[in-house]
């Protein structure tokens, strides 16, 4: 509605630091980015388990839980935490989120979400800014021109100020998990939109490195599940002269199918659990721009590469930096001196 749109705009006017979270993935289950936190494991076929952390416990405490009660626990902690951030990854469609798979269900109804218990339990929104990150769910970001869609429910009834999600079925996971990895690895430094954008640029750079022509190949979603593989191989071979690897197919599949709803200018960040291990200095010297990375005793090279978050979907990520001023497109890397990178360009 127009009211929902204005609320989204109003709540993204000021910077916001994520402090509380509710997570249904094994990733980030240590809760180190949050002051108060709870998670449920919704992807296991075995016994369920959950954990929580607060100002008193400091570290996440883990507990076993019958998987049939995971949704009950999620609803309980949702109401208790009123979380700034929600992260999910289990099976979903435009109209429901299974939590866990085939057992519990969140469903959408006219702009609201409800837990599908014996008696429906509708969930209330929040009075503060909120991010919903559907890192690995199929289809949940697809509004599908339907007021009963999950995306409308998250943005309206659950009052998400920003939402990230897939608009198609997902099997490769590079785009959704990659965005989360960039955001978490750069906690306190990158906003949500910056992380999503940099992950996209990383994917495009990787594709260009394989074959520049890959960037002209669009995944044939309209071919249908039974024909899309053969159709993609045909399109890929026509463009590159080669058959695709699984990774190349996955990159093209994922390239343009994750949506960020919300104001991309919103300054919303994760809280860094420790002092940032480096700072970046930028100077212009004539036609040279000098970027210097200065590390300190808190520096963690593994964290800069992504901290192994969802490594099976997203390998190590590179260091990324937003220049404070616009550079011309013909920037050339000149040389590295110690911890400095020297680029030659004319500043606009």
What are the functions of these language-model segments?
Residues 1-348:
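Cysteine-dependent hydrolase recognition
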């Amino acid at each position: 509605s127009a009211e929902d749109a204005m609320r989204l705009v109003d709540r993204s006017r000021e910077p916001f630091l994520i402090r509380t979270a509710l997570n249904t993935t094994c990733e980030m289950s240590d809760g180190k980015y949050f002051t108060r936190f709870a998670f449920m494991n919704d992807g296991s076929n075995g016994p369920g388990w959950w954990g929580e952390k607060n100002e008193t416990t400091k570290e996440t405490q883990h507990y076993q839980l019958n998987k049939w009660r995971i949704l009950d626990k999620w609803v309980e902690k949702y109401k208790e935490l009123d979380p700034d951030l929600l992260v999910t990854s289990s099976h979903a469609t435009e109209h429901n989120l299974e939590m866990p798979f085939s057992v519990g269900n969140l469903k959408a109804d006219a702009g609201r979400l409800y837990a599908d218990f014996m008696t429906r339990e509708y969930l209330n929104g929040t009075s503060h800014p909120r991010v919903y990150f559907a890192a690995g769910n199929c289809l949940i970001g697809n509004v599908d021109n339907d007021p009963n869609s999950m995306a409308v429910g998250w943005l309206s009834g659950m009052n998400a100020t920003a939402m990230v999600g897939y608009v198609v079925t997902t099997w490769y996971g590079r785009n959704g998990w990659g965005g989360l990895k960039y955001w978490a690895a750069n906690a306190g430094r990158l906003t949500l939109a910056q992380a999503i954008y940099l992950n996209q640029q990383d994917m495009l750079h990787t594709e260009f490195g394989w074959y520049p022509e890959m960037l002209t190949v669009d995944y044939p979603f309209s071919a249908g599940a039974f024909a899309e593989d053969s159709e993609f191989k045909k399109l890929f071979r026509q463009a590159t002269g080669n058959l695709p690897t699984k990774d190349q197919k996955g990159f093209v599949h994922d390239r343009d199918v994750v949506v960020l709803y919300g104001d991309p200018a919103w300054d919303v960040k994760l809280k860094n659990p420790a002092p940032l291990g480096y700072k970046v200095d930028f100077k212009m010297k004539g036609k040279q721009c000098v970027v210097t990375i200065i590390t300190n005793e808190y520096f963690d090279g593994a964290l800069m590469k992504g901290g192994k978050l969802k490594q099976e979907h997203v390998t190590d990520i590179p260091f990324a930096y937003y220049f404070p001023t616009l550079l011309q497109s013909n920037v050339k890397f000149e040389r590295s001196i110690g911890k400095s990178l020297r680029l030659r360009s004319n500043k606009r």
